[in-house]
Amino acid sequence: MLNEEKGRNHIDLSSLGHTWILDLDGTIVKHNGYKTDGYDTFLPGAEKFLQSIPEGDMVLFLTSRTKEYAKATERFLCEHKVRYDLIVYEAPYGERVLVNDAKP
């Protein structure tokens, strides 16, 4: 839950383990950089953010990239020591919608 008193970039989370569901292009790396530049580039602050995710948390990436880019994508993440549990390729281009319960 966003905590307005602590600033717009602060989120209060429970002490339970977390599942981070992150879009890849335009959120973590330059949008379509893998196509236009031929390689991925982190957006400012993204690499540091990813390294701050606690070890026991689950990390899922969603992307509209086709599976033909899977090896290059996973190589980039591995070279930068980005830990993840799953990458879902070929997601629709529209919004990502997450529905979750509120923790007490």
Identify what each model region corresponds to:
Residues 1-104:
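HAD-like aspartate-dependent phosphatase fold
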